[in-house]
Amino acid sequence: MRRRLGKRIAALLLLVLGTGLSACGGDGRPTVLVAAASDLRFVFEEMEPQFEERCECNLEFSFGSSGTLATQISNGLKVDVFASADSDYVEQLEKASLILPLTRQLYAVGRIVIAVPADSELEVETLADLREAHVRRIAIANPDHAPYGRAAKQALQSAGVWEAVVDRLVLGENASLATQFVETGNADAGIVPLSLAISREEHLRAILVDESLHEPLRQEAAVLKGSRHADKAAAFLAYVNGEGRSLMRQNGFVLPGESLQR
């Protein structure tokens, strides 16, 4: 009888300990789960080591299109932070009461570029140049759920070239995939985030698109309700908007309070 009772107590202790450790990394430190727009991949990964040391925690990123991530969060995906490439998807989650009050914040304004492979012989300097027949495939992120794809579509429409190129578009599931299409030569050109073009500058040539041709890419973030580590999640956003500003700027983002004219 005592042996059975002892085994039950041991099993119960393992269950309790396992539940407590599920929100921690293998080193026992808490893990902050961050769902982030794909244009943030390289800059967030640059921030990761210093912030982890500072907060004595681990960061775990899930990158994708903002719309897809927002849908997953609405459907129950458990994360601590949502960093979107626009403000609309954060607002949607706020209206659904899925973010912690007072944590929603602007952290950057994004820019888009026309990009071609570095070794390409194409002379593409303006959106109008994309009309040329020898530009056979043009990559953008899917505008239905990717803010950078929506901005690319708006820019093409504003420049009066959308109808001429729509049948040549190659849609990436997110901005990172659209950038890869250009880098690997699976597209002759693309309209992609400046941040990703900078991170791949050895492989891409890029020209800034006039920001007046599309709605501003006001990138917002928030801490999610139900976060197990809301204090550390908020600390990460404070880091992005504080010490991380220099890295954001180096990666092509316009920061809150700064002018778009650059």
How would you label these PLM feature ranges?
Residues 111:
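Active-site-adjacent helical/loop segments in soluble small-molecule enzymes
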